[in-house]
Regions:
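Bacterial Sec-dependent N-terminal signal peptides
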Residues: 1-23
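Mature catalytic domains of secreted/periplasmic carbohydrate-active enzymes
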Residues: 21-350, 363-366, 374, 381, ...
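Acidic, glycine-anchored loop motifs typical of Ca2+
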Residues: 351-357
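Residue-level signal for short segments within beta-strands and strand-turn junctions
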Residues: 389, 401-403, 452
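Short, surface-exposed beta-strand/strand-loop-strand elements in extracellular ectodomains
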Residues: 393-405
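Extracellular Ig-like/FN3 beta-sandwich strand-entry sites
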Residues: 429-431
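Exposed low-complexity, polar/acidic, P/S/T/G-rich flexible segments that act as propeptides
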Residues: 442-453
Length: 453
């Protein structure tokens, strides 16, 4: 091979620029501009809203979808009142019901009740948010149970189906700031993996239509091989690390779940103080903050949501824009991890700090001590701990810091579950430890993260 050709390939691989058609796109600038949006609204609204299902059954009657008072302008004004600068809307979730009149399926809004036949909710959303001065993004699930887009069943026909739907979304609704893709390369559910549906296949397709649309793969791992922006799944104990330099997005919920359910109109929501602290931390660690606010079955935001978003806006002052991207380094660099035991190589201690929800630590069956310790190699100051567990086995635990030659209790709790998140007095220490005191069976601990708000 010609040496000059080899050199050209090397330069292209290292360059922040990407050639799309005849257009040169500076991906670093696109990513920097996205991070500087700081604060966004995630909007989960789809068939699950009407079924009290977070993963809706994929064969509900389209006529069950009844947005009787849909008002996307209300959503947009709510986002504006909170100081949000972009939004992401669920065009299609894992059940495969599309909220636009897709030409490749009848399982969509056009097949709902006749009064909604001409309703295009994606257009209603994009128009309303643009008119409010808010950038628009879309959410799209490639795991589509209605149309058979599932692991082990991926073929050229359903890949073409997926591409055609993405073409519709990226052609008919103006400039799309980002597209969050879910159900892809994830161990939750049964979506396609990256061998069945290579990341490059969809990224290239998306960028052939909209070169500046960021592809954000919601795969719950800090790996830029499969995404342009890492999405930290805050609802499952995956928190932006204290030393994060990866361009990222953190996604918590204002209500207790992604989709609205009956009774949420009276629910105690995430507090203003929590949101402001999480937002400020994310923004100071190369991450923007995408807060989910779910509309109700009428297609409206509940009054408690409207009030809370306005309170958040009154309490929020966004930080100054980033001027450049940092050098990207692995998360939790330099930390050593020790554990009382591990049940096998697959469940090694280091998994607890890799920011990957699908790797986990598990102690051995005969372990009576059941602790895992993080040594930061030098004193670090923290006041919050976040821990995520898979399958909910822990019944009692404690978290400690090693100070003046002894372990000092920081937090004691019962269940960890998906997302244990607690504050403690500000402490400076080199070593921190989690001990499982009681469990119904061998637990799987996905992440243990310490930060300072």
């Amino acid at each position: 091979m010609n040496k000059n050709y080899i050199l050209l390939i090397a330069v292209l691989l290292l360059s922040p620029f990407r050639i799309v058609g005849q257009k040169e796109v500076n991906t670093d600038d696109t990513i920097l501009n996205f991070l500087n949006l700081k604060f966004g609204m995630f909007i989960h609204y789809n068939m699950g809203t009407y079924q009290a299902e977070q993963w809706a059954y994929p064969f509900h009657d389209p006529k069950d979808f009844k947005p009787s008072q849909l008002d996307c302008n209300q959503w947009a004004q709510a986002a504006k009142s909170a100081g949000m600068q972009y939004a992401v809307f669920t065009t299609k979730h894992h059940d495969g019901f599309s909220l636009w009149d897709t030409k490749v399926s009848n399982y969509d809004i056009a097949s709902a009740h006749k009064k909604y036949k001409n309703l295009d909710i994606v257009k209603e959303y994009t128009d309303a948010f643009r008119n409010a001065g808010i950038k628009v993004g879309l959410y799209f699930s490639v795991w589509d149970r209605h149309h058979g887009m599932e692991h082990g069943n991926i073929n050229q026909e359903n890949i073409s189906f997926t591409k055609e739907q993405l073409t519709e979304l990226l052609t008919n609704y103006g400039e799309i700031n980002c597209i969050v893709i879910d159900g892809w390369g994830s161990k939750w559910g049964n979506g396609p993996d990256f061998e069945e549906l290579p990341y490059e296949t969809l990224e290239a397709h998306i960028h052939s239509i909209q070169p500046n649309c960021l592809v954000i793969n919601h795969s719950c791992r800090p790996d830029l091989k499969y995404t342009q922006i890492v999405h930290y799944e805050a609802t499952h104990g995956q928190h932006c690390p204290y030393d994060n330099t990866i361009p990222s997005q953190q996604g918590p919920t204002l209500q207790s779940t992604w989709f609205w359910e009956k009774g949420y109109e009276n629910q105690e929501l995430k507090s203003v103080d929590e949101v402001v602290k999480e937002l400020n931390f994310a923004n100071s660690h190369y991450s923007n903050y995408l807060l989910n606010a779910a509309p109700n079955e009428k297609g409206l935001m509940d009054e408690n949501v409207l009030t809370r978003l306005k309170q958040i806006g009154d309490a929020t002052m966004l930080s100054a824009p980033l001027k450049k991207l940092p050098e990207i380094k692995p998360v939790h660099q330099g930390i050593s991890v020790m554990a009382s035991s591990s049940s096998g190589k697959e469940f090694g201690a280091n998994h607890i700090i890799d920011a990957d929800l699908f790797t986990r630590w598990q102690y051995a069956q005969d372990d009576n001590e059941r602790w895992i310790e993080l040594d930061f190699k030098s004193p670090k100051t923290f006041n919050r701990v976040i821990c995520g567990e898979y399958k909910r086995a822990v019944q009692e635990f404690k978290i400690e810091a090693f100070i003046n030659g002894e372990w000092k209790l920081l937090v004691k709790g019962g269940n960890i579950r998906n997302n244990f998140n607690a504050s403690f007095e500000t402490i400076t220490a080199q070593k921190y430890r989690l001990t499982i005191l009681k469990a119904s069976r061998l637990p799987y601990i996905a992440e243990l993260t310490f930060v300072k708000y």
